[in-house]
Amino acid sequence: MLSVDYENFDLISYLYNLVRQIPDGMVSTYGDLAEALGDPVAARSVGFMLSINKEPDYIPCYKVVPHDGSVGNYTHPLGSAEKMRRLIRDGITITNGHISNFEKVRFREFKTDYPLRKLRELQFKIGRLYDDRNDYSLDTIAAFDVSYKETRGYASKVVYNKGKIGAYVYSSDSMFPYIPGYLAFKEFKFIRALYDNETMILIDGNGILHPRFAGLATHAGVSLKTASIGIAKHLINCTVKGSDLLISGVVAGKMIGHHTIVSPGNRINVEEAGRLIEQREGKEMRSLLRLAHNLTRLHIETNGNIARYDFSTRNTAIQSS
């Protein structure tokens, strides 16, 4: 379903190339750069990507300012004072911490392919491929969790198979930051790397409960051609009617209790996913996600050098993929 190019897309470098287009004597805003990436929702993520810029003399992030024309912060030992010095050096006038004639020196004419637009188009396609037939088996259940330390991603998979539990870990760099609605492009590559033909996969995230009906669990289930369920802890922007969660008038998820949000990823419908997770087997499935989360934290703490993990009564060897 997805090409390797999309799975490993380096959005950070793409942004840095946009920043390098800003001429001396001009500035752009975080929102301007988000628009150039293809979605204004990425503005906060633009700030994060600029904050980890390790080459400030090559990538002139001092030319990026808040939307109100204030100078703003600068990740430099001298802070905003150094940012003002560089802007003044470029010929920009600053008065009381704000750029004079802001709109006249504001640059928006980026040469861009709007990559986030293309990713949204792909999500619409994936959403349309969601299969709501209850075509699933619980023979092998895999729960996935991914966490990050700067741009390094640490993933874990806990598998339940015929009464036995296995655990696997994988780590890799991720050059795609968190952007609301685009989590799959940050995390799916980790799930693909660990996936081994399990018949049901559980994802810490949403399925069709997503603006384009293509959350991480749907992205993974459709791409891997397997059944999947998304289990999340935080509610996205949707309509709540009792236990039903609606996107654009369509029931796309269920609220189980006060803290569990369930949405089908693939090969299962909303009602069946909610029923399955609410019953006894579902509680056991949720425990697999908790184990995967704990394993991921340990994976990070050991900088990817984990050798063993004790599941209370089980001393389970970890296989690193």
Swiss-Prot record:
Superkingdom per UniProt: Archaea
InterPro entries per record = Endonuclease-V, MethylDNA_cys_MeTrfase_DNA-bd, MethylDNA_cys_MeTrfase_DNAb, WH-like_DNA-bd_sf
Q: Where does Mg(2+) bind?
A: 145, 204
Q: Which GO terms describe its molecular function?
A: deoxyribonuclease V activity; metal ion binding; methyltransferase activity; RNA endonuclease activity, producing 5'-phosphomonoesters; single-stranded RNA binding
Active-site residues, Swiss-Prot/TrEMBL: 61
What biological function has been recorded for the protein in this entry? DNA repair enzyme involved in the repair of deaminated bases. Selectively cleaves double-stranded DNA at the second phosphodiester bond 3' to a deoxyinosine leaving behind the intact lesion on the nicked DNA.
Name it. Bifunctional methyltransferase/endonuclease
